[in-house]
Amino acid sequence: MGGSSAAVSHVIIDCNDPERLASFWGALLGRAVVARTGPYVWLSREEGLGMGFQQVADPKIVKNRLHLDLATPDLMAERRRVEQLGGRRAEGYEAGGFLVMADPEGNEFCLIPEGRIDVDDQGRATYGGEGLSVPTRPDR
């Protein structure tokens, strides 16, 4: 095989309002807006990974094919914070120990507990070990 491999440099999110999403994601991840170039708004780099928001004309209409998993020590507290920043709960799960959330334009991401991830023989992941679940109703 060759002597080099590719590395992830940036995560770019297509959106209608890059200022709005940069504000949401910047507050969520503790990153500042550092640049605006053409249709892009850029957040500060953390751990080598850049994050930008590109303005596009088309609205989001289907489920993401790629999403981020954000690890947190307290799922319910982080859920409340996401909602206060303008995000929302996207789906409920009875098991698995994670929450599917959406940013203000509907881009899905997951909140997962810090720690262990177990994968069964069918490839299904359970976050945080056995017995951890989260409420499935939005009011919990």
Task: State where each predicted segment sits.
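Vicinal oxygen chelate
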Residues: G2-I13, W42-S44, L49-Q54, E83-R140
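Short secondary-structure junctions
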Residues: L29-R36, G86-G92
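Short hydrophobic/aromatic beta-strand micro-patches
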Residues: I12-D14, D69-P73
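Eukaryotic phosphotyrosine signaling hubs
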Residues: V8, K63-H67
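Amphipathic alpha-helical segments
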Residues: D17-A32, E78-Q84
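A charge-rich, low-complexity, intrinsically flexible signal that marks solvent-exposed coils, linkers
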Residues: V56-D58
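Catalytic beta/alpha-barrel core
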Residues: Y40-V41, D69
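A generic structural micro-feature
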Residues: G3, K60-V62
